[in-house]
Every structure is written in structure tokens, then in C-alpha cells.
Amino acid sequence: MVADVLLTHFNQLFCLNDPGHPLTGQEMKKATIVEDGYIAIKDGLIVALGSGEPDAELVGPQTIMRSYKGKIATPGIIDCHTHLVYGGSREHEFAKKLAGVSYLDILAQGGGILSTVRATRSASFDNLYQKSKRLLDYMLLHGVTTVEAKSGYGLDWETEKRQLDVVAALEKDHPIDLVSTFMAAHAIPEEYKGNPKAYLDVIIKDMLPVVKEKNLAEFCDIFCEKNVFTADESRYLLSKAKEMGFKLRIHADEIASIGGVDVAAELSAVSAEHLMMITNDGIAKLIGAGVIGNLLPATTFSLMEDTYAPARKMIDAGMAITLSTDSNPGSCPTANMQFVMQLGCFMLRLTPIEVLNAVTINAAYSVNRQERVGSLTVGKEADIAIFDAPNIDYPFYFFATNLIHQVYKKGQLTVDRGRIL
């Protein structure tokens, strides 16, 4: 087979043997590092991988040849938890955070999520589209090729649908692949204050059926937290969503452990998000149910908290984990997955191999794209992040700098030295 594109002489390729399930425990610690590696691409797919000189049959008169001495290649990075589409910003809350006002106290004062809800409700489709596109561009320039994007800053049907429509439009227009999550249960809207059950009934009866009918989202999520939605309320919504055919996620054990992990395990959610306050019993329940733990260390950093999710304990117990940005305007205003990956080492005490497994193959399972992306594997799409680094440890050791040299998306050179092509 003659390749369309042949990428050769990488210092290292980060490869793994996909076992057919998210990596857990000791599997997280393993990878195949191919020295002097090459990748052959045809019709947007990886058709060959190896070390040294490529087979002659891969090279034809039209084959594009590129050498990458001094560089490494990983699968395209996957950010599997973002609140991508929103209006406004919340830098006016930053001084309050520095003064020690808590996230929940800011929310109780009408700030936080509710502040962004007001800004998003008043934002036009075009405003939200352009703002979200800029964030996606930034992500792409940092090596991200697939992104999960939630609604949840509307808390009414008109705005929630506008957010989902923006995600759908960007999925068509932008190189990054987007996976949509419906999260109208992100907070209790002011018009339903004191009556969350009534709001959940509106979501279940009036919103979820339309989202499903129009295929606007693949996943459903809820914020199970003190002063937001209880475990029983979360169970009520997610069980109805599951009956309608949605895959499930849940924000759980972020600030307080109130039973969200139990709901995730009972309903076999694909992932449970945050988990800073998870207990040993909670870890065991998620392992038993096969739920992926999606950890968001940049949120802990941004909130200036000391309690990071116990990633080391999770992996050693046999749990599958991913890492994501939680990109949002309040608790985590960043879109930089490289920073998150570095926090995975510095604050969660993970190794570079564990972090790379978390943000590639496990993240692919978390967004139900494991058949297409998440590993440098023959037959998968050629989503490739190329780092200006001599080995896989270097992008973690040399922190706070964008080391992306190039990005390939479905076999097309999409980013070249800081420019989107």
C-alpha cells in the first residue's frame, strides 16, 4: 500500500496496545515507546507504524515525506470535560476568590454559574460561536484534537438549545471533533429557586425528548453538589435520561461527598467528574461499576484549594482515570491541556506515561470515540500531536510552555509551528 503521507524519524512515538477497555491499574503505567519511529497515513487513517526506515512499498511518487528528528509524536490529545460555550467572563470574581470567598458563597450571592447564565442568555448565536471558536483554536494549537462540550449556562430551553446548536455548528466547521453533552442541570435557575424538582421535571418532560429527537447531545450530565442538586435529584434526572438512550456523566464529590459517586455506580455512568472529595468506599464503587474517573486538577488549582483528587490512590486501586481542563469562565478559566497534563505530574504525582494514557486512550473511552481515536494504532484516524521535545518526559519537565510543533487531524497537517493552516 502506498501512503499519502509518511512521517519519519521521530525520536519517539508514544504507542500502546489498546486492550479493548479503558486502562486501569498497572495498565496505566505501560506504553510502547518506539524509537526512530515512523507513521504512514492514507485516506486520513494510520496504515503503518514502525521503527527505522519505512517499507519501500509505502512510498510512491505522490507520497509526502516529512522527517521529525528531535521530535516526538503522541495521539491527538482529548479534552473530555469542558464548558465550552458561554457568554461573558468572570474576572470580577477573582478578587473575591483571592480574599477567600468560597465558590459556593459566590454562587449564593448570585455570582458564579448564575452570573454566566445571565450573560449567556443575552448572547447571540454568533457571539457564542465566535467566542467558542477562539477557545477551540487555542486548544488545537496546544495539541487537542477532540473535545467534549457541555451546555448548562442557559438553564432555559432557548439558551440551552442555542449552546447545543453552537456545538453542532463548530463540529461541522472546526478541525477539532466535538462531543456534545446536555447539562441543563448545571445549577438551579433563579426562577426555580427552592424548587429544584420542578425544574428537573421541565428538563425531563420538555427538554430531553427534543435533545434526543434532534440528536443534539450524546451525553447527559448533572451537578450533584451541596446547595445544587442532591443525590436523589441526580438519580431522578439521570435515570430518566438513561431510559431515553443518553450516556451518562455526573459532576460528583467536588466540594462535598453527598452521594454522587453512588449514583454514578448505580446507573453505570460512563464517567464521574471532579472527585476531589471521594472516599475509599467511593473509589471501590466506581471500580466495581467500571466508571471512569475524570479528574480536573486545574480546577483545584484555580480555586486555590489544597485537596486534589487522589489520583495515585485511584490508579493503584485499579481505577481508570482521565484528565481534562474543565474549561469554564469561573472555577477554571483555562483551555490549556498541556498545563493540565503537567499538573497531573506535579500535583497528582502521576508519571508522564500515566498522564498520556489518561488524556489519550482513556479519554477516548470517556467520550465514546475509542474506535476512531485515542491511540497511534493502524486503522484509527491519524490524529497526531507532534511535540518539539527529545522524549516523552520532556513536555512535563519543561512546563508552562507550548511545545507543540505540529498537529495532524485525520491525516491533514492542521497546525504548523503556532499557526492553524
UniProtKB/Swiss-Prot annotation:
Subcellular location: Cytoplasm
Family: Belongs to the metallo-dependent hydrolases superfamily. HutI family.
GO cellular component terms given for this protein: cytoplasm
Cofactor requirement: Zn(2+); Fe(3+)
Protein known as: Imidazolonepropionase
NCBIfam families listed in its UniProt record: hutI
Binding residue positions for 4-imidazolone-5-propanoate: 90, 153, 186, 254, 331
Class of this enzyme: hydrolase
GO terms, biological process: L-histidine catabolic process to glutamate and formamide; L-histidine catabolic process to glutamate and formate
Keywords: Cytoplasm, Histidine metabolism, Hydrolase, Iron, Metal-binding, Zinc
Cross-referenced Pfam families: Amidohydro_1 (PF01979)
Annotated positions binding Zn(2+): 81, 83, 251, 326
Free-text comment on the cofactor: Binds 1 zinc or iron ion per subunit.
Catalytic activity: 4-imidazolone-5-propanoate + H2O = N-formimidoyl-L-glutamate
Principal subcellular localisation of the protein: cytoplasm
Signal peptide residue numbers: none
Gene source species: Streptococcus pyogenes serotype M5 (strain Manfredo)
Recorded metabolic or biological pathway in which this protein acts: Amino-acid degradation; L-histidine degradation into L-glutamate; N-formimidoyl-L-glutamate from L-histidine: step 3/3
Gene Ontology molecular function: any one: zinc ion binding
Binding residues for N-formimidoyl-L-glutamate: 153, 328, 330
UniProt EC number: 3.5.2.7
Residue sites binding Fe(3+) per the record: 81, 83, 251, 326
Function: Catalyzes the hydrolytic cleavage of the carbon-nitrogen bond in imidazolone-5-propanoate to yield N-formimidoyl-L-glutamate. It is the third step in the universal histidine degradation pathway.
